UniProtKB/Swiss-Prot annotation:
Region Disordered: start-end pairs: 1-157
Domain observations: The tiny Arg-Ser repeat region (RS repeat) is necessary for the splicing enhancer function.
Name this polypeptide is given: Protein 33K
Function: Promotes alternative splicing of late transcripts by promoting splicing at weak 3' splice sites. Required for the temporal activation of major late pre-mRNA splicing at late times of infection. Induces the splicing and expression of the late capsid vertex protein.
Outcome of mutating residue 194 to G: 50% redistribution of subcellular location to the cytoplasm. Complete loss of splicing enhancer activity. Loss of colocalization in viral replication centers
Database matches in InterPro entries: Adeno_L4-33K/L4-22K
GO BP terms in the entry: mRNA processing; regulation of RNA splicing; viral DNA genome packaging; viral genome packaging
Localization: Host nucleus
Protein family: Belongs to the adenoviridae splicing factor family.
Induction remark: Expressed in the late phase of the viral replicative cycle.
The entry's keywords: Host nucleus, Host-virus interaction, Late protein, mRNA processing, Phosphoprotein, Viral capsid assembly, Viral genome packaging, Viral release from host cell
Subunit structure, as described in the record: Homooligomer. Interacts with DBP; this interaction occurs at a unique vertex during genome packaging. Interacts with IVa2; this interaction occurs at a unique vertex during genome packaging and seems to potentiate IVa2 and 33K oligomerization.
């Protein structure tokens, strides 16, 4: 605002009424001037504000964004975007009834037996791979049944070996005939057991020949007993 002008009082007039009238006119003139100056300053400020508003771009009116509406479409979109978990299956408790458990055990028993048999077969196949092997024990009857040849020392004479190979089949035949017989037969007070020992331990050809003759006689005696029965 423009600075106010200092009032310069004129010299007092001679007439008092003229003095007061002139004072009132001066006061009114000053007030009018002050009002005009105020209005001019207001007009200048308004024009400056308009110029500034014309130069700066008008800001876009930002409208408040609407609140998210909970609708059926929104819920469907949420469900489609999120992966659906598989439905939980009901836990089935085992049936403890005696009739069902018995039938299940009967059905599973053959499968368990087959599994045990296969495991035993594989274990038997793996046994030869072990370092320590046990030799099977061969009985005299099995040796006689395996072709009638007795395996003895390699330095044994051929004659005694042939006699032993003839005695053992005869002893095996006596063993077959004596099965089921209540009475044990003997020949010259010699039974099947004594003839078997003689065949195993005698080394002379004469002893083995007499053992062969006694074995044949005992075999014929058992055959005659079975024919009578």
């Amino acid at each position: 605002m423009a600075p106010k002008k200092k009032l310069q009082l004129p010299p007092p007039p001679t007439d008092e009424e003229e003095y007061w009238d002139s004072q009132a006119e001066e006061v009114l003139d000053e007030e009018e001037e002050d009002m005009m100056e105020d209005w001019e300053s207001l007009d200048e400020e308004a024009s400056e504000v308009e110029e500034v508003s014309d130069e700066t771009p008008s800001p876009s009116v930002a409208f408040p964004s609407p609140a998210p509406q909970k609708s059926a479409t929104g819920s469907s979109m949420a469900t489609t975007s999120a992966p659906q978990a598989p439905p939980a299956l009901p836990v089935r408790r085992p049936n403890r009834r005696w009739d069902t458990t018995g039938t299940r055990a009967a059905h599973t028993a053959p499968a368990a037996a087959a599994a045990a048999a296969t495991a035993a077969a594989t274990q038997k196949q793996r046994r030869p791979d072990s370092k320590t092997l046990t030799k099977p024990k061969k009985s005299t009857a099995a040796a006689a049944a395996g072709g009638g040849a007795l395996r003895l020392a390699p330095n044994e004479p051929v004659s005694t070996r042939e006699l032993r190979n003839r005695i053992f089949p005869t002893l095996y035949a006596i063993f077959q005939q004596s099965r089921g017989q209540e009475q044990e037969l003997k020949i010259k007070n010699r039974s099947l057991r004594s003839l078997t020992r003689s065949c195993l331990y005698h080394k002379s050809e004469d002893q083995l020949r007499r053992t062969l003759e006694d074995a044949e006689a005992l075999f014929s005696k058992y055959c005659a007993l079975t024919l009578k029965d």
